A protein has these predicted regions:
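Generic detector of solvent-exposed, compositionally biased contiguous segments
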Residues: 3-11, 137-158, 207-222
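Conserved aromatic-histidine-acidic binding/catalytic patches
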Residues: 35, 111, 161-164
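Signature of the catalytic double-stranded beta-helix
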Residues: 75-142
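N-terminal auxiliary "cap/dimerization" subdomain that precedes the catalytic jelly-roll/cupin core
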Residues: 1-96
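Structured loops at beta-to-helix junctions and adjacent beta-edge loops in soluble globular domains
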Residues: 31, 76-79, 146-148, 176, ...
Length: 249
């Protein structure tokens, strides 16, 4: 059965601060992301080779083998960006009932990737977006970055095995880096304390979703292979900004 995919509700980059304040989320098209960063899309697309070299996630409690990932942490304060010593990823059980409450150590992002000017620029702009969303002047943001590949080698892959959730941070950014040979993977965003929701499917590489984590919950539906017996994948980058230190400190 083929289901219609809803297109993302793209906004212009200049509308981003108001959209985050008014509805708690915003979606930029790849062209919008390029404009927002002041960088050619090709510089972002050049990062994609990294996703072919992500080690398996050894912590999946559903017994799955469908997720590979890398992780890195930074502090972002205005134009100052610093990578911090590699550390575990930790979330409280309140925010991640499946994998919360445990120290999860993932392989670090490649040094060559985090040294790229476009990577530094992305973190800087996300810090600015977080400050604008919270109505603060430039302040330190504690940033975690996650490279994910979800594959369908086992028949089904779950981008968010924990279900609809919040991350316990201020700003969440989810970029679709690429997808191939899969159906599904619909993004769903709901008001945390209301009834409004939005659903759409990100299909173009470097489509970017930004979320006010205090106001909305989010999930992505499972992916399946387009053709039985042919494995596919969905690659994403998730970056979170938190004001009061890293979770677990």
């Amino acid at each position: 059965v083929t289901t219609a995919a809803f297109a993302p509700p793209f906004i212009e980059p200049g509308e981003l601060p108001a959209a985050l304040r008014e509805q708690g989320y915003a979606v930029l098209s790849p062209q919008g992301v390029s404009e927002w960063l002041g960088a050619p899309l090709a510089q972002l697309e050049a990062l994609h080779a990294d996703w072919n070299d992500l080690p398996p996630d050894a912590y999946l409690k559903d017994g799955g083998r469908y997720r590979t990932r890398r992780h890195a942490c930074f502090t972002v304060d205005g134009e100052s960006i610093a990578q911090v010593p590699h550390r575990a990823h930790w979330q409280p059980v309140e925010y991640n009932a499946l994998h919360g409450g445990m120290q999860r150590w993932f392989a670090p992002m490649h040094e060559a990737t985090v040294a790229q000017p476009v990577w530094q620029r992305l973190l800087q702009r996300l810090g600015e977006a977080a400050s604008g969303m919270r109505g603060t002047k430039a302040q330190p943001w504690f940033v975690e970055a996650h490279q994910f590949r979800i594959d369908t080698a086992g028949g089904i892959g779950r981008p968010t095995p924990e279900g609809a959730h919040r991350d316990g941070v201020d700003l969440v950014a989810v970029a679709l880096v690429g997808r191939s040979g899969v159906k599904g993977g619909e993004t769903r965003v709901f008001e945390a304390s209301g009834r409004r929701g939005e659903r759409f499917t990100m299909t173009e590489p470097w489509t970017l979703l930004l979320l006010d984590d205090a106001r909305v919950i989010h999930e992505s539906t499972p992916i399946q292979p387009l053709e039985e017996g042919t494995a596919g994948w969905r690659d994403t980058l998730v970056v979170t900004c938190r004001a009061q230190g890293f979770q677990g400190d």
